[in-house]
Regions:
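Short glycine-dipeptide loop
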Residues: 67-68, 91-92, 163-169
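A short SAM/SAH-binding and catalytic strip from SAM-dependent methyltransferases
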Residues: 138-152
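Class I SAM-dependent methyltransferase SAM/SAH-binding core
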Residues: 72, 77-130
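Conserved class I S-adenosyl-L-methionine
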Residues: 168-191
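A short acidic, Gly/Pro-enriched loop at the edge of an enzyme's catalytic core
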Residues: 130-140
Length: 220
């Protein structure tokens, strides 16, 4: 009888521990709607005149990207920003072109070869982990991507670990409800700050490209 009671108690403890572990490993549901990550025609990112409308050189200046920098393009899509950043950081720098879409990663690989940009490193991430090397980045940018992230705390924790002290992290996006390919600026700022970042600048010159805000953060 005593042995049976001990076995039941042990079994109960195992069940409780397993349930607790499963809950800990299961991400909480999104606190707001998110947009489905884009998997369509990548050429839509290559609109003529976009470079000028978005003032991408100014964006890179404000992120303090220079020759020799290592920068992550998170949610790189067609590699539109990646190729421009690659030219900025030069042969001694690197651009980590991350995307969760295997077709996009393959597209960027081919594009980098075609444009002779050996400093672009395509990386296949997951929805919750961009697969970045800890303490490796001098800067990072999410261009029209944040509203697609279902679990920001997980992605931001991985990004935070990858950024060097003082490295700048930029988010360019438009105001929306999350499900309409945009997310309210105040929500983005709150989530990023809760993940251990501090906002250091805010700009709206990206409105010319249909994007409402450009936020810059550093990790605390």
């Amino acid at each position: 009888m005593i042995l049976r009671s001990k076995l039941l108690a042990t079994l109960f403890a195992v069940v409780v521990l397993s349930a607790s572990t499963l809950r800990a490993q299961t991400p909480a549901p999104p606190s707001h709607p998110t947009s489905t990550p884009y998997t369509g025609d990548l050429s839509i990112f290559e609109e003529p005149g976009r470079e000028k409308r978005l003032q991408i050189d100014r964006v890179m200046d404000l992120l303090q990207l220079k020759a020799g920098s290592t920068v992550a393009d998170i949610g790189a899509g067609s590699g539109w920003f990646s190729v421009r950043a690659a030219r900025r950081v030069g042969a001694n720098g690197r651009v980590i072109a991350e995307d969760i879409n295997a077709k996009a990663v393959a597209y960027i690989q081919q594009r980098a070869q075609r444009e002779h940009l050996a400093n672009i490193v395509p990386v296949l991430g997951t929805p919750d982990d961009p697969k970045l090397t800890p303490n490796s980045l001098d800067g990072a940018l999410m261009l029209k991507v944040y509203h697609e992230i279902a679990h920001p705390p997980l992605v931001l924790a991985n990004l935070r670990a990858a950024l060097k002290p003082g490295a700048r992290f930029g988010i360019i996006d438009r105001n929306g409800n999350g499900g309409d390919h945009g997310l309210k600026e105040s929500i983005v700022r709150e989530e990023v700050e809760q993940a251990g970042f501090r906002q250091v600048a805010r700009y709206d010159f990206t409105k010319a490209d249909g994007q409402d805000y450009f936020l810059i953060f550093v990790k605390q």
